[in-house]
Amino acid sequence: METKVSFYEIIQRMNKLNILHRINIHKQAVKNGLYLGQLPILEYVERHEKCTQREVADYMKVSPPSIATSVKRMQKAGLLEKVADKSDLRYNRLTVTEKGRKISKKCRKDFDKVDEQLFSGFNEKECEQLRGFFERMIDNMRTDELANKNFFSLIAEEKKFFDKKSEEE
């Protein structure tokens, strides 16, 4: 495809936008006393009350020990509680504390403000167009094995790729 627009420049702008967004989201997480990956855990446990660490790990496509570390940290901060499963004492069930609910709600609100700032000056039609452009680009980049994977699955795939690459070196 021949064009006067530099694809490289567009990709650089998309990458810059992604980095700026992540920095601003990270600032909001820290302001609310969370590490970056903790809000998705809190929100998952809120939606799936009394879930297991394994279920959270499966959803986020990370290892159970990785979730165990986060859960331990979140317990210590008073955000989550572990409750022994009465029907099977081998399992612990996770619940969000009142403090965790308040922080989750506040953090989500702050994250939404970052997103609102990002899209300020765009009308609804422009946002729909932008979403459509991104969907087309995503479709262009899909391969059979990645076609139906969710966000967390794609992150896990990326990690596997880089882990495999570093093992080869």
Regions inferred by a protein language model and the residue ranges of each:
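Short, locally clustered residues in the helix-turn-helix/winged-helix DNA-binding domain
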Residues: 15, 43-47, 108
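Charged, amphipathic alpha-helical coiled-coil/dimerization segments
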Residues: 75-135
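N-terminal helix-turn-helix DNA-binding core of bacterial DNA-binding proteins
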Residues: 23-66
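C-terminal regulatory/oligomerization modules of transcriptional regulators
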Residues: 1-2, 125-169
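Residues within the helices of the helix-turn-helix
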Residues: 54, 72, 92
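N-terminal leader segment of winged-helix/HTH proteins
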Residues: 1-32, 163-169
